[in-house]
Amino acid sequence: MQGVKVLSLSTVFPNPAEENLGPFVRHRLQHVAKVHDVEVVAPIAVIDYAERRFRRPGIPVSRQDGPLHIHHPRWVYLPWGGYTSAFCLAARLMPFLHGLRREYSFDVIDSHFAYPEGIAAALLGSAFRCPFTITLRGNEVMHVQSPGKGRWIRWALRRAARIITVSESLRRFAISNGVEETHVRTIPNGVDPDVFYPRPRTETRFRLGIPEDRPVIVSAGFLIERKGHHRVVRALSEIRRSGSSAELWIIGGPGREGQFEEHLHREVRRHALESFVHFTGNVKSAVLADYMSAADVVCLASSREGWPNVVHEAQACGAPVVATDVGGVQDMIPAAEYGFVVPAGDEDALAAALRKAIETRWNRAGITAWGRARSWQQVGVETAEVLSQAAAETKGRLKP
């Protein structure tokens, strides 16, 4: 495979102020960089969701992260701007990329998410006569329902040289929105096997301060409504009413989709679960793997996802998963030997599945083998192939 120069565009690439942001983008690009040259443009919003804590003046304009050279140009994000935010992003990046291209003559633009990056990539691809790709990761299903955003998302999708989707459901979504089948490839996310592997349960629980004699549920993700931690709290209340001594560990910190942490604490107090629900805040990936190894079951109660990495990461640690039927979950839990899938929003079904998972004797070695089957190295190779194909195409070289 001949190497090409890739310019990757992502507003969710991890940065020094938000280390837990979009690790799936970073993992993929680190392995793509073993095949192609990769430079990352990860714009930082000057006003991000109008929340002061997301204004990040301390982030460097450029930095090196292993094989990746990363640029952090600033741009003004207008949360009320709708589809115009994508145009604001493209307008800000136009002069920046003119300067960058004098030093780095990129062959293809690799954008993550259709909005705002994919629309911006289509505009930039037209200006620079450069092919571009879009990776669909799940939020497009919501954004396309907006008349303004939907029109421009479909416009960008049809003009991309290639579309990458992280699940088969998103592949079907792309095709239903006008993308040619031959231009879509599904490349699910991977797992880092050096981080996510089973730890000795007794020793790990002791180190984390988790009682050995209690069933443990772990719910991991940003403390935002979409992740559904509040639904797990309510499920725990139902489970404990049936006589179980189960406890819940919620792992994660504030996210970009609004403040929801206080609501979670109110929900805990409303059900008198203060002694049985534990908040850890943000943790490193290795510590997350510790909690997953210590868990009887990991729960994902999201209302919307693309390819939720937490499912395979938990399985790689040997933990069964109870998850709502969103995004690629059916592909990640294809059989009851790996966990249970329940309808999104059905809290009775969620509580029943968690109770059943706690009572089931699982083949944790089999769960581990399934969860570790797909590595980021494999993802990198497959993505590099698509980017090579895109760079050789003329479809993305639009007329200005």
Language model region names:
Residues 282-283, 290-295:
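Short alpha-helical donor nucleotide-sugar binding micro-motif in glycosyltransferases
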Residues 261-283:
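Nucleotide-activated donor-binding/catalytic signature segment of Leloir-type glycosyltransferases, i.e.
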Residues 7, 211-227, 233-236, 249:
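Conserved donor-binding/catalytic core segment of Leloir-type glycosyltransferases
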Residues 1-66, 71, 396:
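N-terminal subdomain of nucleotide-sugar transferases
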Residues 191, 220, 247-265:
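Glycosyltransferase donor-sugar binding loop
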Residues 311, 320-323:
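Short hydrophobic beta-strand element within catalytic cores of glycosyltransferases
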Residues 335-336, 340-347, 355-361:
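Conserved acidic donor-binding segment of nucleotide-sugar-dependent glycosyltransferases
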Residues 303:
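Aromatic "clamp/platform" in nucleotide-sugar-dependent glycosyltransferases that forms part
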